[in-house]
Amino acid sequence: GSGLVGSEMCIRDRAMTAQNRFYRPISEQDTQAGYVDIFLCPMLDIYSDMKHSYIVELKYAKYKDSETRVEELRREAIAQADRYAETETVKRGIGTTRLHKIVVVYKGMEMRVCEEL
C-alpha cells in the first residue's frame, strides 16, 4: 500500500466503521510478506461464532495509464493478497473463519476492478 488518497480513505473508513463491532481493522499490517492494505481480523475472542475474515488489497493507476497497466496492477494485487494470506499473522488472526481476499484497482477516480479471489 501507499499513502491514502480520497477513494482509498473512503473505502477504508467504511470498512472500519461498518465492521468495527465485529472486526479489528488492521491497516498497513506489517507481515513477513510486506504490507496488507486492510486486514479485517475477526474478534473471535468476543464473537467466537464468526464465519468470515477479509483481506482487501487496493491498487491505483493514473487516469492516463493504459488498460495494460490496470491489468498489471490487478495481477500484482492478487499476488500480494495471496502472499499475505499465507503469513503467520493472518493465519493466526483468521482462526477458523473463511478468509475472503478482495482486490480493488482504481484508474483515476474510477473503480476498474473489484473482485474476490
Regions found by a protein language model. Name each.
Residues G1-G6, C10-I11:
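Single conserved hydrophobic/aromatic residue that forms the stacking wall/gate
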Residues S7, T31-Q32, D49, V70, ...:
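Active-site-proximal structural scaffolding
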Residues R12-A18:
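A short, contiguous, amphipathic alpha-helix enriched in charged residues
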Residues D13, V36-L40, K51-D65, Y84:
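Conserved catalytic cores of phosphodiester-cleaving nucleases, focusing on short active-site segments
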Residues Q19-M50:
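Active-site metal-binding core of divalent-cation-utilizing nuclease and nuclease-like domains
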Residues R24, S48-S53, K59, E67-T68, ...:
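C-terminal accessory domains/tails appended to large, multi-domain proteins
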Residues Q32-D37, D45-Y47, K62-S66, M109-V113:
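Flexible loop/turn segments at secondary-structure boundaries
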Residues R69-E115:
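Nucleic-acid nuclease catalytic cores
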